[in-house]
Amino acid sequence: MFSWKKVLFKGVIAVLSLFVFAVAVFFVGMALLTLDPKDRCLDYGGRYDDATKICEK
């Protein structure tokens, strides 16, 4: 027999799992950005030289 409760429950679980996945991807991306020296240099107003890999203030 068709049950709206099961459909609703599975829908809520699907939406929540997508939300949790999106949040996890966001935090992994942010962690990778903080590890990127070029991005850190630009955050502090520096100029990053790709050739020498040095941050110039």
Curated annotation (Swiss-Prot):
Topology in the lipid bilayer is annotated as:
Single-pass membrane protein
Annotated transmembrane regions:
12-34
Keywords for this protein: Membrane, Transmembrane, Transmembrane helix
Q: Subcellular localization, per the record?
A: Membrane
Domain of life according to the entry: Bacteria
Q: Could you name the Gene Ontology cellular component terms for this entry?
A: membrane
- The name on file for this protein is Uncharacterized protein PM1095
- State the organism named in the record: Pasteurella multocida (strain Pm70)
